[in-house]
Amino acid sequence: MRILNQITARLSTVALASVLSLTYVQAQDTKTDSEGSDKEEGNRNVMLNASSANGPREIQIGLPSADVNVLDNGLPVTYATNPHSINSNWRSDASLSHVGLLKISETAITTGNIGYAVNSFTQLGQEGFNGRLDYKSNHFGLQEFSLNLNGSMGKGWYYSTSLYQDFDPGTFKIKSTPFQDRTQIYKAALTKRYGDGRGEFTAMYHYSNSHPVYNYATQSAPFIYVGDGSVKEYGDFRLGTTSYLPTENNITYRDMRTGQLKQTTLYDAIENHSSEVSLMNTYKWDNGLTWKIIGRYDNARGALVYQTPMSLINVKDNNSYNYVLRGVDGQLTPYTGEYVQTRMSCLNSGDIDELLFTSELSKKFSTSTLRVGVNEWYYDIDYTSNTTMYDQSVPSDGSYPVRVYDSNKHSGFFYDFNKNASEYYKGHENKLALYLTHDWDITPKFNVYYGARFEWQSLRGENAAVKNSNGEYVGRFADYYIGATAPDGTKITPTPLSYDWFNYDFTAALTYRLTDNFGLTGDFTYIVQHPRFENFSPATLPNTDKISVPLGRAGIYYNNSWLSLTSLFSYISKTNNNSTLNLQHDGEIMAAPLTYDIQTIGWTTDVMAHPIKGLDIHFLFTYQKPTYKKYETSVTFSDGYEGKINATGNIVAEIPQVLIEFDPSYMITKDLKIWTSFRYFSKTYANINEAYYFNGHWETFGGLNWQVNKKLSLGCTVVNFLNQTGAKGSIAGAELITKDEAKQYNGHLMTGSYLRPFTVEFSASLKF
């Protein structure tokens, strides 16, 4: 969890003003009785993703995201995304009848989570026989198929079946497996519809099996940091199309539960599977009262694997190292390369049982809608993260890296089992919540929306935050496991956990139409949470004080026959973010837990225009300033060096202060559409101390969509058509580097994440 916390808290920390970038405010929504309705944002394709070929894009709100919020039929796809990720259990495919984006206020009230939520619904059976077959490919060899068949069986009974198959080799070949994503999902639903349109009852089964190898295969790559915000490629290594993953697929680890040394493959370690049973019922009365209820049980194995780059060592002509590699004949030979990359392998996995239940009762009046809902969500997990260190070559000729080891220190490839970032927790978490909302048109010009959520959260179980006889945390050490003995003589036994908290959320939005075209709007959401079970995975207990998130927005909107404009100022903050940094010094890794706050102010202007027939233009401009508050921590390394970080007042790492989106599209004919999408991200800092930075870059998309006839549609999409290459995100092992120290590393080799390469995608959809 330490590595996941660090990645999530920094890579997912994003700018506030994009809260508004999902565009129209409530005053501009068109209310319908559809699945999406006025609870959703418009104007944004959440599946147009520059970071992934098969997942929804990250929705930016200016805070470290605890989880990606994706709802399926009103329930979270997974209760927690570590170790059971969204993409391993859900795809936007032919099995869905609707995919939208819930507003922040709706997400907060109905789930208690922070941020937008992708909102999806299953395609249930319809009259007659119906089918939809979707296909997608790209020039790297992706093969993705999705099929839904549904129909009627008579007497009000309907069926729906779906399958999804993904064979994705990624943008570069790896030796350990032919695919960087091998996912299969199957669904079957049986629906009974009541007479007179009263509603329906559905029973559904869902099975998924996924190996998201891309999670670790695309995690990092080497590049030369120039010093002016740009990077150069290292020799013949091509960012995004050359593999930085060693050829070997096996991994040795020490089981956190038993202490046994075990061996597996990375492909097997990242296997996810899930078996779900869902029951859904909707009933409508003549007086406008509607009752919706859904329950789901999920038995799953969740897994995430990280191959996190740590130290990058120049070993050329350095006699203190004696790195060797093993040939195909088993013989050891000296390693003659210039650099060695140390990696921490994190094998996260857990056996999971989820029982999620939501019930809503709503009543429509002439000028308002009142809703009352209940959540009862139960989550049981037995989780470990087994960690292993190993070293690899850093080839400059574009060849595959191989594992190496320093024979002066080790006798094999793997070492420091569970010393860094190993994790353990077992038990259950329960959330019982009552929520209500009221959407009221007080006058034809004045709308008020308000709501509240009251949540009882309980947590019972155990973890491995062990203290010694002096009351000090033991921390992790080499060959750590439950039952081991620490260097100071402390026996490692699980620490019992028992917590009960009261959480609450409030939201209110006001919209006033000054004229038929112009108006004022504002909204405020206040969320109070407490730590979730996964926050108890490190070697120290988290700060269990309340986490408060106030979000306020205010501005104007203007609409006419060809233009819609929204301009708003925003503020959001979050207290008591729990995180753990893995700080590095002279090849040693030390965990540094900390609790910090974040504050973001921003301004967003969003325009949707239809200047001439067939031409649509969307433009978004965001300025934001996300800053750390109370961000201080330190650790003392074995040589006595004290590593300190004080980032209070710094701009949040990896977050641009300026974002621009420009999305024009034109209907060449009534069946042929050409479109482009440009997204600009300004300069971002690549470490917490603002010592390294990356220049701004564009993410670009373009495509042609052809509706051949009523049954068949074809599409071609080009990702990164400007063919920009370079680095993004953070630089591995750079947390302690200061601005003054950074200058000496200009022109040095470093590792980090990178932009998605130029990709041509083809798609087809057939309805029958």
Model-derived regions, located:
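C-terminal beta-signal and adjacent terminal beta-strands/loops
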Residues: 28-30, 683-685, 706-768
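Repeated loop/turn-to-beta-strand initiation elements of outer-membrane beta-barrel proteins
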Residues: 130, 156-159, 196-201, 288-291, ...
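Structural signature of Gram-negative outer-membrane beta-barrels, strongest in the C-terminal barrel
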Residues: 352-354, 364-379, 384-388, 392-410, ...
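Solvent-exposed loop segments that connect transmembrane elements
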Residues: 215-261, 305-345, 391-420, 460-497, ...
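Acidic, small-polar-rich N-terminal luminal/periplasmic segments of exported/outer-membrane proteins
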Residues: 3, 21, 28-128, 527
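Transmembrane beta-barrel wall of Gram-negative outer-membrane proteins
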Residues: 130, 137-168, 172-246, 269, ...
